[in-house]
Every structure is written in C-alpha cells, then in structure tokens.
Amino acid sequence: MFDQNEFHKYATKHIGLSSMHLNGYIESSLTPYIIEERQMNMTQMDVFSRLMMDRIIFLGTGINDQVANIINAQLLFLESVDPKKDIQIYLNSPGGGVYAGLGIYDTMQYISPDVATICTGMAASMGAVLLCAGAHGKRTALRHSRVMIHQPLGGAQGQASDIEITTREILKLKKELYDIIAHHSKQDYEKVSHDSDRDYWMTSEEAKTYGMVDEVLVRKAK
C-alpha cells in the first residue's frame, strides 16, 4: 500500500530535495485534498499523493531544476516500490530548461519500469522531447492536444571567448535533442533538424504520423 508520507521521506532524506520546495510544488500544482473512502475507512490526502498511488505523475508546468528534481524523485521512488509495473506521466507543459529536461529524460530511460507518456493540452519544446521518449507503444495524446518541436533557445553576453563557448554548448545541445527526437520518432535526423529550425506545431494526429506518439486517445478504455 502506498503511504503518502513515504515519498516525502524518500525525496527529502534519500534524494535530498528541499521539504519546502516539495510541499510548495504539491500545494500549487494540484487540487489540495480529496477524501478517499475504502472499506468504511476515510482518509484525507492531496491529489499528488492519490495519483502516486496509481503510479501517475502529472507534469503540468514549465520544466525547471526544482520541477525536474521532484519528477526524478517520483520516478525513482515508484521504481523502488515496484520495478516491473508501468509508470504514467501526463504532460501539459510548454517546455523549459534543457538541462533539467534531459535529467528527466535520462531517468525515464534508466529506470526499470516502462514509462508511458500522455499529452493533455500541450507538449512543447522540452515537453515534446519527454512525450516522445515514453516506452514504444505507450505514448499517447488526447484528441485536441498539440505537440511542438523547435531548436533550443539560448543567449550569450560578455567577452567574445565566452560567447564562443556558449555557442558551442548550444550547438551540442541541439544535436543531442535532435538525436533523441529522431531516435524515438524514427524520423531522419535531417528532417528533424529542418522541421525544428522554427516552431513546428503538430495536432495529435500529425504527431502520430510524425512518430511522436503511438496513439490518439478519444475515450479511456473500459
């Protein structure tokens, strides 16, 4: 049985997350509390914990270091609970920090359970990378969701040598991201590079054709 306090202990003591940041993320991201009734017993818990009971992670915000640390802690915790049972990540994200997003991506690939991804609303930029990185055959999008890929954004200032160093790093990141998308979508690298030169928006059906998702969901299977 999932204990909502166990994840908090795992994240703060084992992973080293700030308790203040973790509580703030939980309280700001989702409806605070629900009442769960089972076999004549009633308990109050936050939606964050209730979803975790069903091995569901909800990423509904921009991706930064704080968010990535919490998502990674959830993935690692759920693997420790059951290394064979699937984990689902629901995505409605405009993207965000590339380094933070790549940290989530690497954790998704590293852990034993399959990670299914579901786009609800929008998966743009780094969000699109995470969407397509789900386990093959388990990447889905709701009917009216949107997926967008583009080249990483960045800027530099200072001495010419500093600008050159930053430029080289951005080019490395761009190649890494395009390689990831090409690998999971089965598209040619050149096509991904060409399409990502500017914002490339896709409907859910177009994302399926492109290889970003495997299925478009209209109604949840009974």
Describe the function of each predicted region.
Residues 1-222:
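Terminal-region recognition feature
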